[in-house]
Design a protein with these regions (language model features):
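Repeated scaffold domains used in trafficking and secretory/extracellular systems
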Residues: 76-90, 125-140, 170-187, 211-224, ...
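Recurrent small/Gly-Pro-centered beta-turn motifs in extracellular repeat architectures
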Residues: 90-99, 144-149, 191-194, 228-229, ...
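N-terminal "mature head" segments of proteins
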Residues: 2-140, 167, 209, 415, ...
Length: 444
């Protein structure tokens, strides 16, 4: 009987060790479903070719007089040059264009649907002069473009559905001042006052709602953001300034708030336990989802890094562990399907991306390629990245994620206006002279 009892105890202990070290991860991986990946809409197995084509003239910018520079998308090869590619809303892209005329340089807001290359509205003329406007989305319906001469600013508010100017005139917003500085926050425009707070912006580029605080906006995810307020954070909607409190007891404070696409994590300091903080995850309504440990942050929808132990762990928003890895916490991450790519290098010139399959727990072949800010997207196996140095003769490179080998590249003229962007699920190329746009699709 004693021997039998000992065998049972040993089996239970062994089972507990197995569950804590391996079994719980296997169980969690079997239940976990990766969030949808925003794949490119066309195969990238071969070098893509032009699909639809359009020109600055087709977008509505009038032709220049003979002997004058042709109108073009207003890209610049200067380090602090014009931001010609303004923003995207789903498959819609918005660009700043320029044309020359007797009165000087005219600036234009243009838009296209990247699915078919159709013009969203005839180009909207903004200011005339050498000073380029800076444009900001302000929700799904409006674009606000600003010109700041150093002493005052003028605004143009454009209805993105009708393509009409609904307001033009003075605005308290500024581009270069610490007071009421215009700042992009997701798909909205806000005005920030350093150490004072954040304002919303209305249909006449006027100030609307106000939230006092540090003047630094954290996030956002969708239209939800956070702002520091003297040892704590306040959470609010960028659409209307509505504030809400996450699902925590009174007296709780927040620190190190970090957003992903469907929620946020925060270091939570419960009243009376300020020296024993814990990181928890929340959805975008402030509802608590799970506990991550003493240190953690989001990496993708519903996916977090827990860095509280000697190893780092990939966990779900509920705190279920999918993977444990020895070594330094990731310098960057990218989720493609069920594979998490982890940059193990802190040298931007020498990236080292190690893939982990979160369904099997297996390590893949590491790649010394750029999957950070220059990454444009993938069809599932081929990753495409932009080449952003205007002086070189390439505009894009593509790599096989299975072998890490480059499979194709796209040439351009050095020091030209050629660029490549992603709009929705489509890669869009600007011609070397800046006058034409085309989609990039798989060859027939």
């Amino acid at each position: 009987m004693l021997a039998t009892a000992l065998v049972v105890v040993v089996a239970l202990v062994a089972g507990g060790i197995w569950w804590n070290s391996i079994g719980s991860e296997m169980w969690a991986r079997a239940r976990w479903q990766p969030p949808p990946t925003a794949y490119l809409g066309s195969s990238m197995q071969q070098a893509p070719v032009p699909g639809w084509r359009t020109s600055v003239n087709v977008l509505g910018v009038p032709s220049s007089p003979p002997g004058v520079e042709a109108p073009r998308i207003a890209v610049s090869n200067k380090q602090d040059g014009t931001h010609a590619f303004i923003d995207t809303l789903e498959n819609r892209g918005y660009f700043l264009a320029r044309s020359a005329g007797p009165s000087g340089t005219s600036w234009w807001l243009t838009g296209l649907d990247a699915t078919q290359g159709h013009t969203l509205f005839p180009a909207v003329q903004l200011n005339i002069g050498e000073r380029a406007p800076e444009c900001f989305l302000n929700g799904p319906d409006a674009m606000v473009c600003l010109v700041d001469d150093g002493s005052a600013a003028t605004a143009w508010v454009v209805d993105l559905h009708a393509g009409t100017v609904t307001y033009t005139g003075p605005t308290p917003l500024r581009l270069f001042s610490a007071k009421l500085r215009a700042e992009r926050a997701g798909d909205y425009l806000v005005a920030v006052m350093e150490k004072e707070g954040v304002y919303g912006v209305g249909p006449k580029a006027e100030l609307t709602w106000f939230i006092p605080g540090s003047g630094a906006v954290w996030g956002p995810a969708k239209d939800i953001a956070a702002q520091g307020t003297g040892g704590n954070y306040v959470f609010f909607s960028l659409a209307d300034g509505h504030m809400f409190t996450p699902d925590v007891p009174d007296g709780t404070a927040f620190d190190e708030v970090r957003f992903n696409v469907d929620g946020f994590s925060a270091r939570v300091l419960y009243d009376g336990e300020r020296f024993n903080p814990i990181v928890e995850s929340f959805d975008l309504t402030g509802k608590k989802i799970g506990t991550l440990g003493r240190d953690g942050y989001p990496v993708a929808a519903g996916l977090y890094i827990d860095a509280s132990a000697s190893d780092w762990r990939v966990v779900t928003a509920e705190g279920s562990r999918l993977l444990s890895v020895e070594g330094h916490i990731p310098y960057d991450t990218l989720l493609i399907g069920s594979t998490l790519y982890v940059n193990e290098s802190n040298n931007a010139q020498m990236p080292y991306w190690q893939p982990y399959d979160l369904k099997s727990g297996e390590k893949g072949k590491p790649c010394e390629i750029e999957l950070g800010e220059k990454y444009l997207g993938t069809d599932g196996t081929i990753a495409v990245r932009a080449v952003t140095n205007p002086q070189v003769d390439l505009i894009a490179k593509a790599f096989d994620l299975r072998t890490c080998e480059m499979v194709w590249s796209l040439p351009k003229e050095p020091n030209s206006f050629g660029r490549i962007w992603r709009i929705g699920d489509t890669l869009v190329r600007l011609s070397d002279d800046g006058t034409e746009l085309n989609s990039l699709v798989a060859p027939d």
